[in-house]
Amino acid sequence: MADVPKDAPEHCPGTESDKSGKVSACQGCPNQQICASSKPAPPDPDLGKIKERLSSVKHKILVLSGKGGVGKSTFTAHLAHGLAADEDRQVAVLDIDICGPSIPTVFGLQGEQVHQSGSGWSPVYVEDNLGVMSVGFLLAKPTDAVIWRGPKKNGLIKQFLRDVDWGDADFLVVDTPPGTSDEHLSIIQYLNQTEVDGAVVVTTPQEVSLLDVRKEISFCKKVRLPVIGVVENMSVFVCPNCKKESQIFPPTTGGAEKMAVEMKVPFLGRIPLDPRIGRACDEGKSFLSEIPDSPATSSYKDIIEKIVKYCVASQHQS
């Protein structure tokens, strides 16, 4: 056989065989481990189904953060609300924070359940043009803990992408867990088949957050995920009465803008700290429509406009 090395033991099955490195003839061969582990995995039949399912989704945006507690899910929700403010847009949100799903709460969808239709799982709709899917809809109680290892998380993410009927969505916004984990690798692996616009990375001004964001950006570069830009959340506190600005989290090393310059990625803007944002999320409401005159609302709208312009430009280039 042409695929049997010259120095191979007798009865070698060959390097291209399914039995390569696994039969008794392979015992003692110095190449046994290489042969046993180097067989390429068969193509995943679900990748084609995912590509077909998402072919009707124009733009796909991942929202990332290096650390928890920086307002990533809050930003995801208000990015979606801001996009859906245009009634001609269809917007979808996918929550892949499997172990800590907060998206149902910030959209006011706690207690909702997933429904099956002839074309797959149906998202839960906040508005006629804003649908949401989350593992939170699959839990019996909001307090139930999800204790899953990587393969099971991977399977659910695949099922969300393959089986949910997203329809003709203009934007799919994906809320991810903090850091870089199995969920990130899975979603990028699957979405790579479907032309992802890129990632928005959310941080706070202090160095302890920026340190992890640098790693997040490096991760994006390694997996060839474009970085749409960095958002500095909770940049300053603006007093709702006197409008005076105060730094709650001082940018000891120059903040997110300086870090973005160093990492050679775009800086999208700063969102000031407003306690009413937290209240709106707890109540499942859109802060942008509830408090339209807040400086934070203006910041959100400016950032969302930049993201839309980026996505439109990337669509024309592809």
UniProtKB/Swiss-Prot annotation:
Residues at which [4Fe-4S] cluster 2 binds: 239, 242
Record-linked CDD domains: Mrp_NBP35
BP term (GO), one: iron-sulfur cluster assembly
A molecular-function term among this protein's GO annotations: iron-sulfur cluster binding
One GO location term (cellular component): cytosol
Family label: Belongs to the Mrp/NBP35 ATP-binding proteins family. NUBP1/NBP35 subfamily.
Gene3D superfamilies xref list: P-loop containing nucleotide triphosphate hydrolases
UniProt name for this protein: Cytosolic Fe-S cluster assembly factor NUBP1 homolog
One Pfam family recorded for the sequence: ParA
Cofactor: [4Fe-4S] cluster
Positions contributing to [4Fe-4S] cluster 1 binding: 12, 26, 29, 35
Function: Component of the cytosolic iron-sulfur (Fe/S) protein assembly (CIA) machinery. Required for maturation of extramitochondrial Fe-S proteins. The NUBP1-NUBP2 heterotetramer forms a Fe-S scaffold complex, mediating the de novo assembly of an Fe-S cluster and its transfer to target apoproteins.
InterPro entries, sorted: Mrp/NBP35_ATP-bd (IPR019591), NUBP1/Nbp35 (IPR028601), P-loop_NTPase (IPR027417), YlxH/NBP35 (IPR033756)
